[in-house]
Amino acid sequence: SGGFDFSFLPQPPQEKDGGRYYGVGLGPGPMGLMGPRGPPGASGAPGPQGFGPAGEPGEPGQTGPAGARGPPGAPGKAGEDGHPGKPGRPGERGVVGPQGARGFPGTPGLPGFKGIRGHNGLDGLKGQPGAGVKGEPGAPGENGTPGQTGARGLPGERGRVGAPGPAGARGSDGSVGPVGPAGPIGSAGPPGFPGAPGPKGELGPVGNTGPSGPAGPRGEQGLPGVSGPVGPPGNPGANGLTGAKGAAGLPGVAGAPGLPGPRGIPGPVGASGATGARGLVGEPGPAGSKGESGNKGEPGSAGPQGPPGSSGEEGKRGPNGESGSTGPTGPPGLRGNPGSRGLPGADGRAGVIGPAGARGASGPAGVRGPSGDTGRPGEPGLMGARGLPGSPGNVGPAGKEGPAGLPGIDGRPGPIGPAGARGEAGNIGFPGPKGPAGDPGKAGEKGHAGLAGNRGAPGPDGNNGAQGPPGPQGVQGGKGEQGPAGPPGFQGLPGPAGTTGEAGKPGERGIPGEFGLPGPAGPRGERGPPGESGAVGPSGAIGSRGPSGPPGPDGNKGEPGVVTAGPAGSGGLPGERGAAGIPGGKGEKGETGLRGEVGTTGRDGARGAPGAVGAPGPAGATGDRGEAGAAGPAGPAGPRGSPGERGEVGPAGPNGFAGPAGAAGQPGAKGERGTKGPKGENGIVGPTGPVGSAGPAGPNGPAGPAGSRGDGGPPGMTGFPGAAGRTGPPGPSGITGPPGPPGAAGKEGLRGPRGDQGPVGRTGETGAGGPPGFTGEKGPSGEPGTAGPPGTAGPQGLLGAPGILGLPGSRGERGLPGVAGAVGEPGPLGIAGPPGARGPSGAVGPGVNGAPGETGRDGNPGSDGPPGRDGLPGHKGERGYAGNAGPVGAAGAPGPHGTVGPAGKHGNRGEPGPVGSVGPVGALGPRGPSGPQGIRGDKGEPGDKGPRGLPGLKGHNGLQGLPGLAGQHGDQGSPGPVGPAGPRGPAGPSGPAGKDGRTGHPGAVGPAGIRGSQGSQGPSGPPGPPGPPGPPGASGGGYDFGYEGDFYRA
């Protein structure tokens, strides 16, 4: 906030000793009042660099009252690089600031790869209707044998090492192996046959930890690269054991299930960094491949795979190996050449802070007048109140890289702050594109399982196999031991920066209220309609690279930053169909399905030919009509008697069991037609005579007229079963009668042969996602494992969110300027006291912070205890209320080292004034050099498990089975009553997976999640107009020199 010095312009010529000389003053002029910023002018081209040695700096001008803050101006052009000055003395230890805001949620550990759920088999083709007689409902069939479990595919080649993942949990001890070069992405080999699980071997002893090598110099930061395109998905690897359940993410839009990306290498846990402003979230890069784990003992050479054995018992756990001693710290780096000494600045006197001036109206830019004589420096004005921090300006082009300055004195590491609260769960990753599907192969005959041979070289990429039916869920394995921490991954290339939006007007700051007690959980709200996804903004241009500072030792790793999911990509085109996989193993029996609707009655079978006509018996006397008795079982048909009068239709009896079909007989000879006899009258019914012997069958007489309908007689006795008549040629189909009442369920029939695999059916549409499941009970925590030796320092983490601004304190009295003292050596650090118990956080008070105490020394790390056995995974508990904020944490690690400025003259050190209250948080300073690595802190408490994730999407229907064989033509039976629905029939064989269905409708919006983390700082506002020029500065002094007869003053 100073005036502009225009004294470098050529002055009017003045006579001296017969020649002319021109003044070229280079000192800053006195600081004028800061007017409102004018509109942003266009960036002019940089002028040519002036000549002549640098003049003495002028006296500093008065500090005028601060004007109202205008909008930020346009980014200026980068000036020439100044000479690096001497390193400043290490600053005094600052007051411990308030505890930073809750850390951003760490990315939840990737869950173990869950077995991909197989698609449901498509419904089988409807069998052709049998031409046989409609019989009783058949017995429910047995469940069909599920297909064999698909072979476990050979694992693909290891992918390249991707960008480093977020900081994982602290790993156990183990020697850190060197990072190998990234191998090329290999193609997946053909699927092998699955071997039976072998016996579980005993765990070998943990190897000794090797000595740590010297810390190498830090490499220069590479230029930011553009994110490459997402590569094609790799072949799915074998299903791993079920891992520990990670925290559940917010429910996303139900997409097609993507291939799980490999897991990044967990870096060592660093000390808590100072909470800075949150950076803009970049676009998510492609998921990196899983890095290599550290070497754990030398593995023996792999022998050929033996025949499948039975599952062995769990072996005993081996003894823990001894922790290796930490190696010596590497030698310090070579001291850099000292930079050129900067010009000394003039001693300025600090002015008193004055009140903030009101913002004046922007006046028109006046015409520039001639430069007046240089006035004497005025008395320092009152310093205005500290304004609100301005928005960060646009990044200007990078200047040329200056020479490296002298390395500063290493500061001692501060005390490690308390562990931050566990962050919220990250977003669910977007699914990857689905691979192409191949044509289904014909099912071959199952051969004997041969012995697995040695592993061959990986073949070319095969098509993705079809999804097999879901196998039985395996028993959840115990929690594996934590492996050694791998080396820190390479720093990923930064993604392109987004365009800077307009900054909102800063609102007035409200008074922070007291913390209220958490209220009871409200009722669950109804789901609102799903909102539309916002459009992705265009990517901004990549800024130029800044000059690299001197390489410092690696700093402590900060807390993991937030990984936000980018917008969902458009659904990919469905790939080609994959080749049919080996049929999967037998699945578990499914539950009995709901009863389907009653189908339409089938057509009646062809009517059989009439049997031979028997001789008519004598007519019996008409008795009283008796009540209908229960229908007995139907016996075989007897010989056909003479036709009587048509009786009333009786009620339908229960269906009898269908007997075996008789052999088809030859059609009989056609009888001759008899002569038509005279119509007789009805005679008086005589007494019943004795039954005579049956006479020979006579020829059929002509049909007489229909007689009157008689009353129904009493039920007759069941006669002896007659001989079965031959089956005649089929007659025409009769009229279908109404369906009768349902009969009792029949017995279970014999199991039919397995049908051949049918053609691929159409892909069904994807159903909507189900509601989220209920949260289970929380299980007991397992015993903590042993702490390992300090790991190597990881890359610097992202800056945390800014803390809450404190109330401005009262201004202290102005101190008298003292005489400049020599730079003192830093005093020794005190011993750190034991950490106190964590108490509840109180309300923010208006008190003044006390003076900072001395930093204690770090204690020696305790010896590691043996790791405890893993407990059984318990039921997941309900998520608790958010706890109260913890106490104020210790100051974080020093920020990055900034560019060294020219060293000024040593000012007089004033008497320390009273400590004021913490003012508003200023803009982030440049990063200082990292101090030496501190002793590793204690392992943090594990956080609560997140809520249970959403259920997976329903798989596709399976393939339709082949139509069944047509039934044989049986005799026509009477339509029986419709029986109740039998139990669910056997599942048909699973065919190859169908093509991908269309994307389902997005599910309903889930309940509101927990309040997210603090938002990032908004983009900077538009540049403001430049202010008016200040008065000219005092002459900087100089000397005369001649050039071609003219004198110049430098």
UniProtKB/Swiss-Prot annotation:
Presence of keyword Glycoprotein:
yes
Summarize what the UniProt record says about post-translational modification.
Answer: Prolines at the third position of the tripeptide repeating unit (G-X-Y) are hydroxylated in some or all of the chains.
> In what ranges is there compositional bias, type Basic and acidic residues?
78-92, 670-679, 936-947
Hydrolase as a keyword of this entry, yes or no, is: no
Q: Which residues are glycosylated?
A: K114
Pro residues: bias regions = 1020-1032
Q: Where does this protein reside within or beyond the cell?
A: Secreted; Secreted, Extracellular space; Secreted, Extracellular space, Extracellular matrix
* Residue positions, PTM 4-hydroxyproline: P10, P13, P40, P46, P377, P380
Tissues in which the UniProt entry reports expression: Expressed in bones.
In which residue ranges is the amino acid composition biased (Low complexity)?
33-46, 56-77, 161-190, 236-257, 298-311, 320-338, 355-371, 406-425, 452-467, 530-547, 598-642, 649-669, 687-697, 718-727, 781-808, 816-841, 881-903, 911-926
Residue stretches spanning the membrane: none
Its function?
Type I collagen is a member of group I collagen (fibrillar forming collagen).
This chain's protein is named Collagen alpha-2(I) chain
Lineage, top ranks? Eukaryota, Metazoa, Chordata, Craniata, Vertebrata
